[in-house]
Amino acid sequence: MESSLPQVAALDRSTLLKAFDETKTGVKGLIDAGITEIPSIFRAPPATLTSPKPPSSSDFSIPTIDLKGGGTDSITRRSLVEKIGDAAEKWGFFQVINHGIPMDVLEKMIDGIREFHEQDTEVKKGFYSRDPASKMVYSSNFDLFSSPAANWRDTLGCYTAPDPPRPEDLPATCGEMMIEYSKEVMKLGKLLFELLSEALGLNTNHLKDMDCTNSLLLLGHYYPPCPQPDLTLGLTKHSDNSFLTILLQDHIGGLQVLHDQYWVDVPPVPGALVVNVGDLLQLITNDKFISVEHRVLANVAGPRISVACFFSSYLMANPRVYGPIKEILSEENPPNYRDTTITEYAKFYRSKGFDGTSGLLYLKI
């Protein structure tokens, strides 16, 4: 009898997940319904909720880099290259200020994502889908049916480059802003990839010529206030499967980066953007730049809004093969990974979900 209990529990969980998904109202729908306790499908394994705090030291805050001028003169350029290379190598995360994207564009992007998630439920349901190939998708937890616990957030996402959605496919609340903001992020990304190329000792356009800047996936996240934030997470520990990610976050906070086995807070800085190295950049730089794990805490305050832009073609057809850059390999620095395509890696990454392990282990030699 006892041996059948796990099967019964799994069946019950599957039923609950299906029922939640079929509402098409996401986590916000639970809050709108007035819940005071989180459903069991959101209860995270206790081990994933641990929060070892770093020593009280400035050494445990991610670097902030001033991009003012974009390194147009040689002295400033060398300084920027050194700072960004150092941050990508030691932290995998950094914030940028004076990045060239106007404050009003940042604010309108945050407001647009909020308006989408808070609009009439029936309108929002029209965008609900679990098809990753869709041009425009609203859902809650892409790995809902495979993860140990669901995350406390809802997401609107679309590819905005190289082929943005048709105007008629965009949400009225934020569609135009998503396209405008993406264009600004693409310009910033081009500069960052140039600086990262130079930090590797390569030609300025090396990473661009590898098509690292060609595709952009934009995800607008909505983290509703949580009645029991100590029992769940806004986003489970994971690393990104991109080349580079640029994140816009509002004032609520909750993002943490794993550094030297400590969870380090990334406090919101007005006007700043958070940049992090993705798995694909770690792969092609042969571990020179690191893709580190990060997570988002649930919060009784909220909603928290963030907009993440991923430089990667993800599940879009892309036959190009990627492996460690040959120009940086040597006898002392042999390749650590086998070659792959973005599509192959993205499918593996999606199938494993946010299980707390690095997808790069799949490609290790």
Swiss-Prot record:
Give the Gene3D superfamilies listed for this entry: B-lactam Antibiotic, Isopenicillin N Synthase, Chain
Name the Gene Ontology biological process terms: biosynthetic process
Q: Which PROSITE patterns match?
A: FE2OG_OXY
The Swiss-Prot or TrEMBL record annotates one GO molecular function as:
dioxygenase activity
**Required cofactor names:** Fe cation
Q: Tell me, what's a Pfam family for it?
A: 2OG-FeII_Oxy
State whether keyword Metal-binding applies: yes
Q: Which family does it belong to?
A: Belongs to the iron/ascorbate-dependent oxidoreductase family.
Q: Spell out the protein name for this chain.
A: 1-aminocyclopropane-1-carboxylate oxidase homolog 1
Native source organism of the sequence: Arabidopsis thaliana (Mouse-ear cress)
